[in-house]
Amino acid sequence: MVQRKSNLHYNIYGKGIPVILVHGFGEDGSIWDNQVNFLKDYCKVIIPDLQGTRSSPLMEDKNTLTIEHMANDVKDLLDQENITQCILLGHSMGGYITLAFAEKYPNYLKGFGLIHSTAYADNEAKKVNRARGIEIIAEYGGYSFLKNTIPNLFGEVFKEGFSDAVDELIEKSKLFSNTSLQAYYHAMMVRPDRAFILKESQLPILIIAGTEDVAAPIDDLHEQAKLSATKYFHVLDGVGHMGMWEATKQVNEFILNFIENI
């Protein structure tokens, strides 16, 4: 493992085609540990911590951070490593960043993917919920907020059978400042719809969905998968928003198949 830091702290594992895995809201790069341990024998895996996460400082104000800022951070990472083409995969908020990157820097990509993520912008009800979340974080703290929301990300079978893993993710959430969490929520709330990227891109696109995912509903992802002619679309039965943990073997195989077929 090689540790590097630009604006972002990131780790590099293995050799070969560069594959960047971007974590989501309330997570850090360790969310991908199960994927790293598998994929590092097949490719160069790069795991950044987004700004405001762990050792990566928050560079923007909580009211000015955007998804595009975080996509630019990924571009800076690639430039620092002299990487001119990669595969970019994002989980949840990381998928929003991946789409913003695909819009702005398509020539850097051999392919990209959304793992439990959506190209749609927040609807009005979701924006209201985001705004309320920002208020709750300010009033009660980020840890309290995530302690209540994280369990809802998992499918029922995993949540009941692997409560220790759910507790582990909750415990890691203590690392986040209130400001960082509010900044992420604001960035997600104001992001534009990027469904057109799926329709217009000629790049291979990976989409992984869970039938019990309440954050990235399966019906939305079915609709979005139909937009792309170059898609790899996989559905995880009985899985919520966290397939990297809930269905590790399947997710690893889906990602490797995507890499090997590009």
Predicted regions and their residues:
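Active-site loop/oxyanion-hole signature of alpha/beta-hydrolase fold enzymes
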Residues: S6-L8, Y13, V36-N37, C43-L89, ...
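Short beta-strand element of the alpha/beta-hydrolase
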Residues: I17-G24
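Serine-hydrolase catalytic-loop signature spanning alpha/beta hydrolases and amidase-signature enzymes
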Residues: G24-N34, V45
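Gly/Ala-rich beta-loop-alpha elbow adjacent to hydrolase catalytic centers
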Residues: G90-G94, T98
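Flexible "cap/lid" loop of the alpha/beta hydrolase fold
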Residues: L99-K104, Y108-K147, L153
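Conserved alpha/beta-hydrolase catalytic His-Asp/Glu region
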Residues: D122-V128, Y140-E200
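Conserved loop-alpha-helix segment in the C-terminal half of the alpha/beta-hydrolase fold
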Residues: Q202-V239, W245
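Post-His helix in hydrolase/transferase enzymes
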Residues: W245-I259
